């Protein structure tokens, strides 16, 4: 009976998670792609005006777009079709290092805010295939949650240069963490680091969400969480962010 009970519980959890996914995807999953390919890119190429994007870089292959959620949240997106973390294009050497480009674009937050925002308050995140609402790759550039900031500060010396479980996880979910230098982040995509260094990740990249956070010693911590429906983890690394930017009012 115990085994039957566990099986039924697992079925209920999976069905519930699928229901959440259906609700999340019930809108237009191509809305961001249409903005990039049908508005921002043509306007830049034809009129040298990036609107409605904040910036369009056709040769570099990306745009920066002000998200409607939160006063300071921006998105970095490719100027061509890449769905998300599951795309094999992200593991090709010729593909831009979108996380590094997103980090370089963090200045838009300060410009919008009207004051310099410290790097320690900024985070980058991309959600998994199930954890996202849009089918065009987009990296969230936004504030970090104050409690996540505090936890990562406390774990500073315990985060290795190898992918290892983060003690206690984050937001009730298991996370892997890896420390990198600024030079490493600039030269090598976090997508490649995950695919090449975590067993079996390459074959299941769509299950993963990734985040990048600056540490007080000027290193960066890469965070990765894998979808697990039994624990109701849809792998949405955006959960470590706070789009209201409460961390700025506490400084």
Curated annotation (Swiss-Prot):
User: What is catalysed by this protein?
Assistant: a CDP-1,2-diacyl-sn-glycerol + H2O = a 1,2-diacyl-sn-glycero-3-phosphate + CMP + 2 H(+)
Membrane topology term reads: Single-pass membrane protein
Family annotation (NCBIfam families): cdh, PRK05471.1-5, PRK05471.1-6
Q: Which organism is it from?
A: Salmonella enteritidis PT4 (strain P125109)
Q: What is the protein named?
A: CDP-diacylglycerol pyrophosphatase
Quote a single Gene Ontology cellular component term.
plasma membrane
UniProt keywords (A-Z) are: Cell inner membrane, Cell membrane, Hydrolase, Lipid biosynthesis, Lipid metabolism, Membrane, Phospholipid biosynthesis, Phospholipid metabolism, Transmembrane, Transmembrane helix
Major localization listed first in the record, in broad terms: membrane
The family line of this record is:
Belongs to the Cdh family.
> Which chain regions cross the lipid bilayer?
5-25
A molecular function (GO) term = CDP-diacylglycerol diphosphatase activity
| Enzyme category, top tier | hydrolase
* Enzyme Commission code(s) on record: 3.6.1.26
Pathway listed? Phospholipid metabolism; CDP-diacylglycerol degradation; phosphatidate from CDP-diacylglycerol: step 1/1
BP terms from Gene Ontology: CDP-diacylglycerol catabolic process; phospholipid biosynthetic process
According to its UniProt record, what is one Pfam family this protein matches?
CDH
Which InterPro entries does the record cross-reference, listed alphabetically? CDP-diacylglyc_Pase, CDP-diacylglyc_Pase_proteobac, HIT-like_sf
Q: Where in the cell is it found?
A: Cell inner membrane
